[in-house]
Amino acid sequence: VSKEQAPKAVSKVFIGVSAGMVLGVPVTSFIASEVSFSMAMLFFTVVNALVFVATILFIPSMPVKEKVSYGAQLSVLKKTEMWHSIIAVTLINGAMFGFFSYMSDYLKTVTEVSYNVISVVLLVYGLANIVGNVLAGKLLSINARRSIIIMPFALLASYICLFFVGEWITAMVIIILILGVLAGIASNNMQYMITDSAPEAPDFANGMFLTSANLGTTIGTAICGAFITEMGTRYSVFGAFLFLIASIVFVYLRVRMPHSRKQVKMDILAE
């Protein structure tokens, strides 16, 4: 696809990830609550085995057309823009998945709903995530800078609302629906920030995106868990607050870089 259409193509990949979340998280939660944790793990095993077989049978061979040396790939780490992107992605993903790791517990402890209701709410989150991925491709194609800047603020506002309405299930469903859409958009934004920082090494950049995202999930889960240990489940969202406030700084630094200003001009011309 063309460079202009690349965000839309990437969003389709994230739609697949979200679709897995739509089915996987609620179904696994339901199996664990109604049968046993062991059966939930068996479900994971079966699904992964099927995916492995499908990959062998249906994913075509993709030979390398132009080799990029390891030195050339690693050289992108000399870019300040890349490091701003990496830190921003780590923080944003840490906020989203740090809290998401405890969302079921939050709904059970704070909102006080049954496990069946939790499964439905998680399904709503996953479906909203798909919608967010669809919107993300369009938003990045129209004005990437605007989408990237707004996202941390939108997520922060949503988590603040979630903290104050945690006891009311109707309000929680609405907030989680919004968070699902925003998370879908944010995932695409994060991937765009890193790959756009290193167009000369797209595969390496994509690897750095996954590394940063996973690092954020690990740290975010630990920080949100620490708030639960010290203050209670309700305050797990404070970890997301801290990560998002810090991410705003690095997103701002990222979009101020020369390459980003060039992209801004392209966005304006596109409008």
Predicted ranges, named:
Residues 83-122:
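Extracytoplasmic gate region of multi-pass secondary transporters
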